[in-house]
Amino acid sequence: MNLKGKTLKELEEVSLSIRERILEVVSHNGGHLSSTLGAVELIVGMHAVFDSSRDPFIFDVSHQAYAHKLLTGRWEEFATLRQFEGVSGFTKPSESEHDYFIAGHSSTSISLAVGAAKAISLSLEKNRMPVVLIGDGSMSAGLCYEALNELGDRKYPMVILLNDNEMSIAEPIGAISKYLSQAIAGRFFQSIKGKVEKLLAHLPEGASYMAKRFEESLKLITPGILFEELGLEYIGPIDGHNLKEIIETLRIAKAMNKPVIIHAQTLKGKGYKIAEGPREHWHGVGPFDLSSGEPLKKPCSSSPTDIFSRTLLELAKEDEKVVGVTAAMPSGTGLSALVHEFPNRFWDVAIAEQHAVTSMAALAKEGYKPFVAIYSTFLQRAYDQIIHDVGIMKLPVKFAIDRGGIVGEDGETHQGILDIGYLRLIPHMTLMAPRSNESLKEAVKFAKDFSLGPIAFRYPRKSFVLQEGIFSESPFLYGKAERLMEGKDEVLFVGFGNGVGRAYEVSKVMASEYEVGLVDLRFVKPLDHETLWELSKEYRYWLVFSDASKVGGVASALLEWKAEVGAEVEILSMELEDEYIQHGKVEQVEEEIGFDVKGLSQKVRERLERIANSQRLLV
């Protein structure tokens, strides 16, 4: 939709229709709502002043970019938002040329803009300029300031729209958020600042010194001091819902041909009164009734996250040494109740995964029992800290890895399929996984008192595949596997975490063909060498199930063990392929990639038949 030349009234009508479309689709499909509604006028302003087919439009996280999608030829397709093979909930270049870069994790936008600006400068292009939209929540991460530090020195022309709604996902945390929220009306100060700068240019040296001191004192009460000290131009705060003011400011910033930060104050959930209230509830939502705001499906009260939360709360009440941290996801990781109950022992440190891990390393050194509750996809942001600050000193930090496996509608930037591979590489790391809710309780208890080094346990977003009561649960024993079913054929199913449930369901489907054995590894590091050796004498063909990538995964660990001890077994991975997994409902995605029970059963059957055929050829 071309917004150039449209009147202010027409642009306001466009904004209204965009909000209506977003509400219509998100109430049906689910998605990121409040941040999206709050950014509508800012995005309309961007499209009215800049050209997304030419200027790199870079959205931090990009969950707030729905209006951008609607303005760039995806109005009808938007009905498929976050559905399998439909419109992504984030910017995606393969979906549209107007989506400059893929996003999903926070605080990358300014670095991308600096890189784009360098390319524009090297190409000697005069008519292109990066435009960034970043929320105040993302400004709590250090990557932003690494980029701003270089930008202030290099002075690449760009416009950075800082969307300040005094909210990230949860309650804003830290000095940066407090600094932004204290911003005062900026026009008066912009006017005074301009007059002071003109005065400085005409005063003799002695008087100029006094005027310069006056300017420095003025900065103490203006909201832009932080950015100006970094060498950037600052405009604001402006009303992020006033299109006239937004467009005028964007035009001024564009004409300055410098790095300019526009500080816009907005209201999350703008235009939908119900969503203008509670902070976290309306960030990411499932389908809901538009008139009442009530979810169409009640959330499960016994999700793995809830089980983890309740178990850790019980342990924290019993043991004052139990502490914990989350990075801007207290509700999503289940730490909200603990932050509320024990505010001096559980912390939300904002979008700062590196800081979260390193700070817990120090607590572990001081004799505390720190839990880092974090999504699998976000833990990778702190990989160096896990190695350097936790691993080398063998500190007993406990990593509770939520969303392990396929997470669904958020797509490739959020799938939790790499953690087994990247954690298994770390010396002295213990890596385990529960198979059920009851097993998860035991995992949390085991991790609490584990003292040999760092320990991690992973669990899925949705319910475990394995139903409760199928197998009796017992406490975890360090490095010990558990034999669950004995088979009469030479086929053994090896499960890890949620893979145990998948293996069990496949065994039922194939019961008429094979009577298989089933073992729950429980630990992929260290492996239970004794039990594995015993199993190698009973079963020739091992099929390995886990909810993670096969590269560096559980089967890889078993193949390393096989090579080390010389076990005469065939190890076949039923894990996820070495690919990024697209968005869609978990059930649809699993069916498409052959990771549901039907697909896995067929894969097992084909692999075993291939082995049988090859043996016949050798006879």
Swiss-Prot record:
SMART domains: Transket_pyr
Top-level division of the source organism's lineage: Bacteria
Record's catalysed reaction(s): D-glyceraldehyde 3-phosphate + pyruvate + H(+) = 1-deoxy-D-xylulose 5-phosphate + CO2
Residues reported in the UniProt entry to bind Mg(2+): 136, 165
Gene3D superfamilies: 3.40.50.920, 3.40.50.970
Any one GO BP annotation for this protein: 1-deoxy-D-xylulose 5-phosphate biosynthetic process
Cofactors: Mg(2+); thiamine diphosphate
Pfam families, alphabetized: DXP_synthase_N, Transket_pyr, Transketolase_C
Pathway(s) it belongs to: Metabolic intermediate biosynthesis; 1-deoxy-D-xylulose 5-phosphate biosynthesis; 1-deoxy-D-xylulose 5-phosphate from D-glyceraldehyde 3-phosphate and pyruvate: step 1/1
EC number: 2.2.1.7
Keyword Phosphoprotein among record annotations: no
Binding site for thiamine diphosphate: 63, 104-106, 137-138, 165, 272, 353
GO terms for MF: 1-deoxy-D-xylulose-5-phosphate synthase activity; magnesium ion binding; thiamine pyrophosphate binding
Cofactor note: Binds 1 Mg(2+) ion per subunit.
Keyword list, A-Z: Isoprene biosynthesis, Magnesium, Metal-binding, Thiamine biosynthesis, Thiamine pyrophosphate, Transferase
Task performed by this protein: Catalyzes the acyloin condensation reaction between C atoms 2 and 3 of pyruvate and glyceraldehyde 3-phosphate to yield 1-deoxy-D-xylulose-5-phosphate (DXP).
Family per similarity comment: Belongs to the transketolase family. DXPS subfamily.
Quaternary structure and interacting proteins, as annotated: Homodimer.
Name of the protein this chain belongs to: 1-deoxy-D-xylulose-5-phosphate synthase
